[in-house]
């Protein structure tokens, strides 16, 4: 399965698919400080970059989609701060960023690419710099399998390659970083739904805080990990 084809569609013709991400992205931007140099890996609709820019953050962007990068360069005047490329081979210098954001990215990567990508994050972060991000929580990958009607190939509708729980995410990050937090968190677009759905969301949030309830959209693992030293 070609991940680039899937993401070229969602970031361009299918950009409306990111409309439910605002609560998550606003939360992530609140963790960043004005004046910090921050790299966002995986631009989606460009909403995080826009939110960060309004807060006075020196925001940079990396994404494999050249069309998505061109759009964000033009819309936010990012110039060379927005680059087309891959997380396992970042076109940025060593010790360059105060923080790197990877929200809903790691689940799209094969195991070896995930490890190489985290090594690259470590390389481009300053000492004490933070990796901040999210992945879907305890996703059942088979629930989102679809079949191509033309060729019969079966694949995950969003291109996910891996599912994570808190122990698995902790183990993954420990290889490169000092962990500050790894926990489940529930995001919900309160302003865009009626009272009935708000009540349902509150119930799901309560159950999620206790590791119970349903899986699905808005239920994530949130993580923060810090670069403590240079690799030996």
Residue ranges and their predicted role:
Residues 1-93, 99-103, 115-118, 163, ...:
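Conserved N-terminal segment of class I S-adenosyl-L-methionine
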Residues 37, 128-130:
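Short glycine-centered segments of the SAM/dcSAM-binding site in methyltransferase folds
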Residues 59, 131-132:
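A short hydrophobic/small-residue beta-strand
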Residues 115-127:
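A short glycine-rich, Lys/Arg-flanked "PGG" loop and its adjoining helix->strand segment in the class I
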Residues 104-108:
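Short catalytic micro-motifs in class I SAM-dependent methyltransferases
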Residues 151-168:
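Acceptor-substrate binding/catalytic loop of class I
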Residues 132-154:
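Conserved class I S-adenosyl-L-methionine
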Residues 90-92, 109, 141:
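Helix-loop segment at the mouth of the active site in Rossmann-fold oxidoreductases
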